[in-house]
A protein has these predicted regions:
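Structural transition elements
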Residues: 1-38, 56-61
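Long beta-strand-rich cores associated with HINT superfamily self-processing modules
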Residues: 177-205
Length: 205
């Protein structure tokens, strides 16, 4: 499961333990029910929404699982909608959705390739999230020269995401690799999943 937006394997990123990791599932369920009730939803007035995803068997399975859990735990009525890629992109770009499935693979091996997506002016900000403190933290991190200070800024940004939930990360991409023990320099901690031959070498065996 994903406890942060930024993958844990990202170079230089040292995530703090999130609220999701500190509480039991029962406690989290109770909080979700309380938030729904505070928003005016409940058994007599269930929240109804559409979950949009681009056509794919794996995306469909995840969407069905999410809808089932939301119904069972929270009484939410979820309608599933799948669209072919071009139509899906149009819906995503115009904001024509209630909840949408999306993913991101880093452009470079540093946390800002993920966290920058939720800044208010980023073209990839599908959630249309706007938070001045969040924007300020990313700009501040870009000026820092102390790695510990950068990590602190990134963790504060992750906390804002956790508190305000513009997105709900559920998993991170992983790829299995079989690497001979005499092959060294293969980048294990790299969310790009890019391996450059110039960094690898073979030891005597």
């Amino acid at each position: 499961p994903a406890y942060h937006f930024t993958p844990d394997v990202t170079a230089g990123f040292k995530p703090e333990v999130s609220l999701l990791q500190q509480q039991s599932q029962a406690e989290l369920d109770a909080q979700a029910k309380a938030l729904l009730q505070a928003a005016g939803y409940g058994p007599n007035n269930p929240l109804k929404l559409t979950l949009l995803y681009n056509t794919s068997e794996s995306h469909q399975k995840i969407a069905i699982a999410v809808a089932s859990m939301w119904k069972k735990k929270l009484g939410i009525d979820v309608k599933l909608q799948n669209q072919e890629w071009k139509t899906y992109i149009d819906s995503r770009n115009t904001g024509n959705f209630d909840v949408i499935r999306a993913s991101w693979v880093g452009d470079y091996n540093e946390a800002s390739t993920f966290l920058s997506l939720l800044t208010s002016t980023h073209s990839g900000n599908i959630a249309k999230f706007k938070n001045a403190d969040y924007d300020k933290l990313l700009a501040q991190a870009g000026r820092e020269t102390n790695p510990a200070a950068v990590t602190a800024d990134y963790n504060k940004m992750e906390q804002i995401i956790a508190d305000q939930a513009p997105i709900a990360p559920i998993y991170q991409y992983t790829n299995g690799r079989l690497i001979k023990p005499w092959v060294k320099g293969y980048p294990i901690t790299n969310p790009e999943d890019v391996a450059y031959s110039q960094t690898m070498y073979i030891i005597k065996h």
